[in-house]
Amino acid sequence: MTNVITRFAPSPTGFLHIGSARTALFNYLFARHHNGKFLLRIEDTDKERSTKEAVEAIFSGLKWLGLDWDGEVIFQSKRNNLYKEAALRLLQEGKAYYCFTSQEEIERQRQKALENKQHFIFNSEWRDKDSSTYPTDIKPVIRLKVPREGSITIHDTLQGDVVIENSHIDDMVLLRADGTATYMLAVVVDDHDMGITHIIRGDDHLTNAARQIAIYHAFGYEVPSMTHIPLIHGADGAKLSKRHGALGVEAYKDMGYLPESLCNYLLRLGWSHGDDEIISMTQAIEWFNLDSLGKSPSKLDFAKMNSLNAHYLRMLDNDSLTSKTVEILKQNYKISEKEVSYIKQAMPSLLVRSETLLDLAKLARIYLINSPIIYEQEAKEIIENCDKDLIKQVIEGLNKIEQFDKESVQNKFKEIATHNGLKLNDIMKPVRALITGMTASPSVFEIAEILGKENILKRLKII
């Protein structure tokens, strides 16, 4: 295969969408698999909607996922002179023309076609007019002169050959009246100028492909290989939207997902390698090919995503888990070295109850001795309705323990339960609520051993 060059070309109008992240991943893996280049282009020609914040979100999202691009980032907003020269070249070669038709007239024709239940294709009266007839008081657009006869074939590696009759393609605008390029022209000029060999993108771009190929043909450029992948859908099979949950990569980071886990999950959304579920980035680069892409839309499954993330969490060592957990906690708490040591000691038992870093951080709050406990509503109700005399017995019993380890603590609770004719859980339920603020947590006996007698008694005495 020739030197492979792929590109990821997002519009900076919001966050880095989870579907866009998958597109970037596929382009990255394909380029790396073939020892090629993965380029980044920011399609910011829409000045009203493009923002610096969105550009930064794209950069940070890609870096967090580990999708490092090659070379300098291309900004379309800085390349309009290149697009203008390209449009004028087609004009000089008779492959484009000035059009003076107003938007109002085009809209009138569209409405007429709609009323007659006809498919609307704008046919400009200026297509073959002599320049001597041009009005001098109207700024024209430049339109592509699409051949009236024949057809365009999209040779898609996934969808197969898609044939579009030229009669169904309008003479699209290349250069607006204000001299700025349209998306269609800019994309083709950039892909050619950047040497793009393979275009991998969502199948929502399939309708654009025929129009872009018409521009490629007009310039005499070689058309890159095209692969249009099905979009990601929600669990209900509908197109992914806000009601399905988080859409931006940054949101998944904030929810405590690991980048390695998210890449693995996105990779399996529409691509497979036998029955392999756990695929490292190294393996993905080695195995990735376009032949294994699926033709049907993939459904976002948070249960599977959580399960996969839990697996990747368990691959991290104790120090790394502690560091990542403390980093999250520091967003809201001032953490002492003593508290860090508690969390590190407790990490194995926290990990078995967690699927995300956020789960870990929530449980790790138990060990923040310098911060007030956050009580769940159910825990509050348990505390309010518990036997206060029983808790006093617990305080007295624990205070008598000399070697405050989990075995001694457990034996003391059993002793108190037997003395009162209770089951062990009858005591542990309110004690857990008081010590952790939760109704479900790691072993209270282990928590007691890690925090020590003084901290445990302090929490029990608030009642």
Swiss-Prot record:
DNA damage keyword on record: no
CDD domains, per the entry: GluRS_core
A molecular function GO annotation: zinc ion binding
GO BP terms: glutamyl-tRNA aminoacylation
Motif residue range(s): 'HIGH' region: 10-20
Main location: cytoplasm
UniProt-listed Gene3D superfamilies: 1.10.10.350, HUPs
E.C. number(s) listed in UniProt: 6.1.1.17
InterPro entries in alphabetical order: aa-tRNA-synth_I_cd-bd (IPR045462), aa-tRNA-synth_I_codon-bd_sub2 (IPR020751), aa_tRNA-synth_I_cd-bd_sf (IPR008925), Glu-tRNA-ligase_bac/mito (IPR004527), Glu/Gln-tRNA-synth (IPR000924), Glu/Gln-tRNA-synth_Ib_cat-dom (IPR020058), GluQ/Sye (IPR049940), GluRS_core (IPR033910)
Subcellular location: Cytoplasm
Motif 'KMSKS' region location, chain numbering: 239-243
Positions that bind ATP: 242
Keywords carried by this UniProt record: Aminoacyl-tRNA synthetase, ATP-binding, Cytoplasm, Ligase, Nucleotide-binding, Protein biosynthesis
Catalysed reaction, written as an equation: tRNA(Glu) + L-glutamate + ATP = L-glutamyl-tRNA(Glu) + AMP + diphosphate
GO cellular component terms attached to this protein's record: cytosol
Function recorded in the entry: Catalyzes the attachment of glutamate to tRNA(Glu) in a two-step reaction: glutamate is first activated by ATP to form Glu-AMP and then transferred to the acceptor end of tRNA(Glu).
Subunit and partners: Monomer.
Family: Belongs to the class-I aminoacyl-tRNA synthetase family. Glutamate--tRNA ligase type 1 subfamily.
Record-given protein name: Glutamate--tRNA ligase 2
Source species: Rickettsia felis (strain ATCC VR-1525 / URRWXCal2)
